[in-house]
Amino acid sequence: FEAWLNLFTETGLYWFPAQPNQDNPHDTISLIYDDRRLLETRVRRLGNPRIHAQVPHSRTSHIIGNVTIEDYLSDEGDLLVGSNFQMLEYRRDKQRLFGGSCRHGLIRAGDGFKIQWKRVNLVNSDSMLEGISVIF
């Protein structure tokens, strides 16, 4: 989980809107809206071998496609990137399928990029969902 956390900047945001086409995380409830401090807490909890939400640990498979550069955000090479995904989670003899789209605000960091913000748009974000304890 640390490697995933290290993809984010020190001011990075991770957002799952609760409504389709939700424009602002401050106007209505979100499924997840984490700043860097909350991301660090999430990763620390997920790394704990006794975390109740992940006993037994989920097995997951991720498929990411249709990756596109949607916009160039600065002369320094910062990017807005979009993609579609499917994530299968299997845990306690139960299988769940999540699907949707992601948008990433990426900023130049050395020879690569870091995630300034990540927005995960679940197709069924406005339906009843059991707790989400895996990272996308």
Where are these regions (language model features)?
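Hydrophobic pocket/interface hotspot
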Residues: 4, 39, 106
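Short acidic-aromatic low-complexity motifs
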Residues: 1-7
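A beta-strand edge to alpha-helix "cap/lid" segment located at domain peripheries
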Residues: 68-136
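A solvent-exposed, acidic/Ser-Thr-rich amphipathic alpha-helical stretch
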Residues: 10-81
